[in-house]
Amino acid sequence: MVSLIDQNQLDSFIEKNPSWIIDNKTIKKEFKFDNFIDAFGFMSKVALLSEKMDHHPDWQNTYNKVTIELTTHDMGGITTNDIKLAESIDQLINT
């Protein structure tokens, strides 16, 4: 079951993943790549992952940069699904 995370859980996530920032009721991260093709390839991987998890990011792409914001709109904030997706996205980068 999806639930909003509390401040302690959010602080713990940010401590372990300092490249993600809290922005209002979202967690946000900017990814930089060598070029547009690499950025778009990353977005394709995230799209497949998101579809599999049935949880989708808000994102923006400008040339070699991809900004991802995660929140659960119908819950009104950051949930366990957002944390799981953020961790899974980071694993894509680290593999």
Question: Each predicted region: which residue ranges?
Answer:
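Solvent-exposed alpha-helix faces
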Residues: 44-47, 87
